């Protein structure tokens, strides 16, 4: 141990134990001490050795503890990925030891917003010093050196930081500020990466929307796998972090409410957790367009789903083709989603593969359910606005063969919900959910009319049997007025 006159027998309370890799196996503690003492007094060095050899040989790594936290950070800044020691092929790796991660800087660092631009670092220190020892205080400044009205304050413990948040967040409005002071934990590197991904995805989706390729559901085939995979990756990361705000900020996901976001994030989390699950069904793919298979199989009825395994399983293979390459999702991963969704219940598949196939079908059904709610906002916004004017709540009929009867609608669905769900297939001239005049509650059925029969047929193909919650939609042509029954 280094017992210099400049330091007591023990290191400072906030000192960091650092792990150091990529050091020569021939180096002794003396050699390492000479290297590290350039940055500050060293309290202790512990070389990791292979005890199976006689005498024990160095593993080429060590732990070092400086007397001060400042010295450790200076050494890390100067050495980590910067300096290559004699005889080594890679630069030194230096980072806090695992035991130090519980007190990582990102867990103690606060962002302070809405502060007066007249405040100095000393003013901020005085303002927050009553909550504990401040390790660092820095005001953000522009190229001109003027304050941007925000700062970072790092305490020595997370408890101190939490106390400061409780006491100071929105506690006062400072001079020249339009709203109260903001005090919160600073964004971590993971938070920053998530925001960057969200911004990137939003830009890509806006470019797609501007291209006006969303005239009907067939336009989904123009959406590249990289966009869908990026969606899945973001969902998985967001679900694992528990932060749904990132999802709700996405333009294409604007049609989802909080509960749907949570369910969709849960599905993605299950996929992420199950990525290492071995599966014998990875060979399931489809020769046709992956997205066309996904959309066409959405129209299968409950009976056809249980008797014919081609559509849902081929669709899962297609989903694997789309997202597997970049997001690591495989068919085995999808099986892990089954527990999060009621799916097809216990009907299963009659191809003899048992519960695995049933789980896969349930998983597909779960994805399908929440993808439906997001679809409308993927379409050109100008088109949506034009269609929605006067269509919701109207009972105007289209030409023969263009009028649909929809049964098994969710109780909470209104005219606007019905309109948005069927707009992707063509120009909707009217969408009406029927209401019981006595109870003022939905009768769970309605009518949708298009301006052409082709759109109506596309809607039937994709939406008949489509699952929303615990219900499967029944979508069929409305009979002509000459028939004795309207449907």
Swiss-Prot record:
RRM1 and RRM2 domains preferentially target UGU(U/G)-rich mRNA elements. Pfam families: RRM_1. There is a cross-link at residue 109 (Glycyl lysine isopeptide (Lys-Gly) (interchain with G-Cter in SUMO2)). Residues 277-310 are annotated as: Disordered. CDD domains: RRM1_CELF1_2_Bruno, RRM2_CELF1_2, RRM3_CELF1_2. The modification Phosphothreonine is found at residue 4. It is found in: Nucleus; Cytoplasm. Keywords: Acetylation, Activator, Cytoplasm, Isopeptide bond, mRNA processing, mRNA splicing, Nucleus, Phosphoprotein, Repeat, RNA-binding, Ubl conjugation. RNA-binding protein implicated in the regulation of several post-transcriptional events. Involved in pre-mRNA alternative splicing, mRNA translation and stability. Mediates exon inclusion and/or exclusion in pre-mRNA that are subject to tissue-specific and developmentally regulated alternative splicing. Specifically activates exon 5 inclusion of cardiac isoforms of TNNT2 during heart remodeling at the juvenile to adult transition. Residues 16-99, 108-188, 402-480 form the RRM domain. GO terms for biological process: cellular response to polyamine macromolecule; cerebral cortex development; mRNA destabilization; mRNA splice site recognition; negative regulation of cell population proliferation; negative regulation of epithelial cell proliferation; negative regulation of gene expression; positive regulation of gene expression. The modification Phosphoserine is found at residues 179, 303. It comes from Rattus norvegicus (Rat). GO terms for cellular component: cytoplasm; cytoplasmic stress granule; male germ cell nucleus; nucleus; perinucleolar compartment; ribonucleoprotein complex. The modification N-acetylmethionine is found at residue 1. This is CUGBP Elav-like family member 1. The keyword Phosphoprotein applies. It comes from the Eukaryota. Residues 283-310 have a biased composition (Low complexity). GO terms for molecular function: BRE binding; lncRNA binding; mRNA 3'-UTR binding; mRNA binding; pre-mRNA binding; RNA binding; translation initiation factor binding. InterPro entries: CELF1/2_RRM1 (IPR034196), CELF1/2_RRM2 (IPR034198), CELF1/2_RRM3 (IPR034199), Nucleotide-bd_a/b_plait_sf (IPR012677), RBD_domain_sf (IPR035979), RRM_dom (IPR000504). The gene is Celf1. The keyword Repeat applies. Gene3D superfamilies: 3.30.70.330. Interacts with HNRNPH1; the interaction in RNA-dependent. Interacts with PARN. Component of an EIF2 complex at least composed of CELF1/CUGBP1, CALR, CALR3, EIF2S1, EIF2S2, HSP90B1 and HSPA5. Associates with polysomes. SMART domains: RRM.
């Amino acid at each position: 141990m280094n017992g210099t006159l400049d330091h007591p027998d023990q290191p400072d309370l906030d000192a960091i134990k650092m792990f150091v890799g990529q050091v020569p196996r021939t180096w002794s503690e003396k050699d390492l001490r000479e290297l590290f003492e350039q940055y500050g007094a060293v309290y202790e060095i512990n070389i990791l050795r292979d005890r199976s050899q006689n005498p024990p040989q160095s593993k080429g790594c060590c732990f070092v503890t400086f007397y001060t936290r400042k010295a450790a950070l200076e050494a890390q800044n100067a050495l980590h990925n910067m300096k290559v020691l004699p005889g080594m092929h890679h630069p030194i790796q230096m980072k806090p030891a695992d035991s130090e991660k519980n007190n990582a800087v990102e867990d103690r660092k606060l962002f302070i917003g809405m502060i007066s631009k007249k405040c100095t670092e000393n003013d901020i220190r005085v303002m927050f010093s009553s909550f504990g020892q401040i390790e660092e205080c820095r005001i953000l400044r522009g190229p001109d050196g003027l304050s941007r009205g925000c700062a970072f304050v790092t305490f020595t413990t997370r408890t101190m930081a939490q106390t400061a948040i409780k006491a100071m967040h929105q506690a006062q409005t400072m001079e020249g500020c339009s709203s109260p002071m903001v005090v919160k934990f600073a964004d971590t590197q993971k938070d920053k990466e998530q925001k960057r991904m969200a911004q990137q995805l939003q830009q890509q989706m806006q470019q797609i929307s501007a291209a006006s390729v969303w005239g009907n559901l067939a336009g989904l085939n123009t959406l590249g796998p990289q966009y869908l995979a990026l969606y899945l990756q973001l969902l998985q990361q967001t679900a694992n972090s528990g932060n749904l705000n990132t999802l709700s900020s996405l333009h294409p996901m604007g049609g989802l409410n909080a509960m749907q976001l949570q369910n969709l994030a849960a599905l993605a989390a299950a996929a992420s957790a199950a990525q290492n699950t071995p599966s014998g069904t990875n060979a399931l793919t489809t020769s046709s367009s992956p997205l066309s298979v996904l959309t066409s199989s959405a129209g299968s009825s409950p009976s056809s789903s249980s008797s014919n395994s081609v559509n849902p399983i081929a669709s899962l293979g297609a989903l694997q083709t789309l997202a597997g390459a970049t997001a690591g999702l495989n068919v085995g991963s999808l099986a892990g989603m089954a527990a999060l969704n009621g799916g097809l219940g216990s009907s299963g598949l009659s191809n003899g593969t048992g519960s695995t196939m049933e789980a896969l079908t349930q998983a597909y059904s779960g994805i399908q359910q929440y993808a439906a709610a997001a679809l409308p906002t993927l379409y050109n916004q100008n088109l949506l606005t034009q269609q929605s004017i006067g269509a919701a709540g109207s009972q105007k009929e289209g030409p023969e063969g263009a009028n649909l009867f929809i049964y098994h609608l969710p109780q909470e669905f209104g005219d606007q919900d019905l309109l948005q769900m069927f707009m992707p297939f063509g120009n909707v001239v009217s969408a009406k959910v029927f209401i019981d005049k006595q109870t003022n509650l939905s009768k769970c059925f309605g009518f949708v009319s298009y301006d052409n029969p082709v759109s109506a047929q596309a809607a039937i193909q994709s939406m008949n049997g489509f699952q929303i919650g615990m219900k499967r939609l029944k979508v069929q042509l409305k009979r002509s007025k000459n028939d004795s029954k309207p449907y």
